[in-house]
Amino acid sequence: MSKKIEFIDLGLPSGRLWATENEEGYFTYDKAKEKFGEMLPKPEAFQELWKEGRWFWDVKNKGMIVVGPNNNTIFLPTLGYGGSEGFNNRYSYGYYCSSDFRKDISCPIVLNFNAEAVWPESNFHYSCGLSVRLCREV
């Protein structure tokens, strides 16, 4: 994490702050946990963002604009995921890594969305590269 991470207050009940940008690149669950540690969102952070935010599909930029209770916003691009054969679902789905892992099925828990729906606690393939948006507990 060589660049300075900027955070924004969305006015969420927890006081949690969200990074204004994604981390550059795609990360497997293990690499994300190793590199970002405590700043990797817990599933409850994604749940809060989903429940408390207003989500709007941005047709031009292909992603979700999330408006917090205080009207501040973040943009979550749909960057798909990195697999063994390159990138998949780019510009149609967003897959964001959380800090948690389901051992019973060997899958990280992710925030997943497309133009029609948001799944704040989805499961995803262990070895795939995911997007990362950091948050900070206050």
Regions picked out by a protein language model, each given a short descriptive name:
Residues 9-13, 17:
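Extracytoplasmic/periplasm-facing segments of secreted or lipoprotein envelope proteins
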Residues 31:
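Tryptophan-rich substrate-binding surfaces of secreted polymer-degrading and adhesive proteins
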Residues 1-4, 16-26, 35-138:
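C-terminal, surface-exposed recognition/capping segments
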